[in-house]
Amino acid sequence: MSRRNAAEKRPVLPDPQFNNRLATMMISRLMKHGKKSTAQRILAQAFGLINERTGGDPIELFETAVKNATPLVEVRARRVGGATYQVPMEVRQERGTAMALRWLVNFSRARNGRSMSQKLAAELMDAANEAGSAVRKREETHKMAEANKAFAHYRY
């Protein structure tokens, strides 16, 4: 770890196309090898597909999907006297959002066939409807935290 001061957090600017901070964060997570324009196109196409299928505002659905996939608690490993305990801890809002976006992108990539924009649109629609792999992952995370509640006093 660096001995210097922690890097200053830079504010996330809203995306010029969608005027939304979450969209900017999603584009950053989608991007591979610095190809930002490709990531922007994938997100725009996914929003287009969502608009076609639902007829609603894709930005609202996207925000709902992220909210539904955001974990409130997680378990972190803590070593105490030779034993490693899974200690449940609350997740800060910023980290929770980052985890939700990461899960949405990863599970979209893991879906079968079709283009990335179609897979992303499907995952976002599932997450907005409290279904899909990203929401299931959040539920698993919450279950793990619940199961290890006895070690909550080891929090740091």
From Swiss-Prot:
SUPFAM superfamilies: Ribosomal protein S7 (SSF47973)
One cellular-component annotation, GO: small ribosomal subunit
GO molecular function: rRNA binding; structural constituent of ribosome; tRNA binding
Assembly and binders: Part of the 30S ribosomal subunit. Contacts proteins S9 and S11.
Family listed: Belongs to the universal ribosomal protein uS7 family.
Biological role stated in the UniProt entry: One of the primary rRNA binding proteins, it binds directly to 16S rRNA where it nucleates assembly of the head domain of the 30S subunit. Is located at the subunit interface close to the decoding center, probably blocks exit of the E-site tRNA.
Protein's UniProt name: Small ribosomal subunit protein uS7
